[in-house]
């Protein structure tokens, strides 16, 4: 994509033209990925890096924290017409605990996902998920 396209996507996200962010998390086996471009299987692990990469836009002042959270949670739930995306009495308690300023280097070998392939290998980011809860139960906690 061109730099103009990249900037237009960020502007669209910031002003609400783009409603939601999705990772399209599609883990791929290393052998299936390490092929010439044409025959290589499409996909990459994304769930391990989604929050930190989105927080990059927040830290750079390109979108607000509120807008990022809306695009990652409330908007997808609304688009799909499913409950969720907010914390409310009697609702599903699906949420994450994270440290927005915690710095780390993306290293696929450390992913919890089934795949360790990432186009962001060795990329410095900020934002670390400490725990993920689904229906109020911890499904992931960082050691």
What are these regions (language model features)?
Residues 1-4, 41-45, 118-125:
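A short acidic, glycine-rich active-site loop
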């Amino acid at each position: 994509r061109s730099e103009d396209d990249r900037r237009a996507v960020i502007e669209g996200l910031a002003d609400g033209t783009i409603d939601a962010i999705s990772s399209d998390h599609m883990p791929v086996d290393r052998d299936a990925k390490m092929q010439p471009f044409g025959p290589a299987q499409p996909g990459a692990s994304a769930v391990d890096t989604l929050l930190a990469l989105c927080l990059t836009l927040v830290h750079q002042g390109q979108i607000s924290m509120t807008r990022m959270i809306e695009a990652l949670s409330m908007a997808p739930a609304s688009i799909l017409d499913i409950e969720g995306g907010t914390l409310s009495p009697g609702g599903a308690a699906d949420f994450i605990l994270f440290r927005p300023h915690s710095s780390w280097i993306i290293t696929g070998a450390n992913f919890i996902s089934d795949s360790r392939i990432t186009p962001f290998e060795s990329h410095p980011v900020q934002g670390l998920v400490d725990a993920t809860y689904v229906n109020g139960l911890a499904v992931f906690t960082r050691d």
